[in-house]
Regions:
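Short acidic/histidine-rich motifs immediately flanking catalytic phosphotransfer sites
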Residues: 65-73
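Hydrophobic/aromatic beta-strand patches that form the interior of the parallel beta-sheet core
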Residues: 6, 50, 74, 99-101, ...
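Short, glycine-/small-residue-rich phosphate/pyrophosphate-handling segment
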Residues: 107-145
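Extreme N-terminal starter segment of soluble prokaryotic enzymes
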Residues: 1-5
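Short beta->alpha junction loops
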Residues: 48-57
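Short, acidic/small-residue loops that bind anionic groups at enzyme active sites
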Residues: 91-109
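Glycine- and acidic-residue-enriched helix-capping/strand-helix junction motifs
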Residues: 15-31
């Protein structure tokens, strides 16, 4: 059985590798997504990656998913982390758990995520390897459930 995970790349992720490289690193969004796909393949997981700078588009995308096809979701809310959007409520209403991932540690910069309370867990501070860490943890937690 194929295990599917949806990955949401939030606002300003398309600026990765261009802006604030000292915080977020030199990898572009395309490079980050390629790494996610490589890590997923190594775990025998299928990923669907979606990016938008518009919170309403993210909500519309999530509401349009066939929720029976996914075991989990991963979100790097990026610019949506501290914004008041419908994303947290939409995530909370999903039939599968979501996990928040950040390559850096937002708390180190005093950032408090408005998305995290709707998530089952989080992975912060491992660079873009955090997506693979999250996918591995999702699979392990399903084995022990």
């Amino acid at each position: 059985m194929v295990q599917n995970i949806v990955v949401i790349q939030g606002a300003a992720m398309d600026k990765r590798g261009i802006e604030q490289v000292e915080i977020f690193g030199p990898e572009t969004l395309d490079e980050i997504n390629a790494r996610i796909e490589k890590d997923a393949a190594a775990l025998d997981v299928s990923v669907q990656i979606f990016h938008s700078n518009d919170a309403a588009e993210v909500v519309e995308f999530l509401r349009g998913l066939d929720q029976t096809q996914y075991i989990a979701g991963i979100i790097n809310p990026s610019g949506f982390t501290i914004m008041d959007t419908q994303i947290p409520d939409t995530i909370a209403a999903m039939n599968f758990p979501f996990y928040e991932v950040h390559g850096s540690n937002p708390a180190k910069r005093g950032v408090v995520s408005k998305v995290l309370p709707s998530c089952a867990g989080s992975v912060w501070g491992f660079g873009h390897a955090g997506y693979g860490v999250a996918m591995g943890a999702i699979l392990q937690s399903r084995e022990t459930a």
